[in-house]
C-alpha cells in the first residue's frame, strides 16, 4: 500500500537531515574559531528547519480538516528526524555560545 503523503514525508526527512548536518557544520566552524561561518551555517540550518516545519504543519492542518493521514513507520521516522534535528540544533547553539566565551578569555 502506497502512502499518499510519501512526498511530504520525504520532504520532512530531507529538510530535517539537512538542518542537522548544517548545525554540525556550524559546530565544526565554531571549534575552529570561525564564528561568522558558524552563524552562516546556523542560518541555513534554520531555513531547512522552517521548510520541514512548514510541511509538517501542512500535514497537521490537513488532518485537522478531516483528511486521513496515514501513520506509517516512514511518518514516524520523519517526525523522529525533525525532533532530533531541533534538539541537536538547540544544543549546538549553546555549545557555540560556550566556544565564543572560551575564545574571549
Label for each model-derived stretch:
Residues 1-105:
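Terminal alpha-helical segments
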Amino acid at each position: 500500500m502506497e502512502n499518499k503523503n510519501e512526498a511530504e514525508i520525504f520532504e520532512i526527512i530531507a529538510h530535517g537531515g539537512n538542518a542537522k548536518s548544517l548545525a554540525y557544520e556550524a559546530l565544526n566552524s565554531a571549534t575552529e574559531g570561525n564564528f561568522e561561518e558558524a552563524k552562516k551555517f546556523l542560518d541555513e540550518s534554520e531555513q531547512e528547519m522552517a521548510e520541514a516545519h512548514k510541511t509538517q504543519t501542512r500535514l497537521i492542518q490537513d488532518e485537522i480538516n478531516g483528511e486521513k493521514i496515514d501513520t506509517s513507520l516512514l511518518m514516524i521516522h520523519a517526525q523522529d528526524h525533525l525532533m532530533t534535528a531541533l534538539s541537536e540544533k538547540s544544543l549546538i547553539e549553546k555549545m557555540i555560545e560556550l566556544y565564543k566565551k572560551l575564545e574571549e578569555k
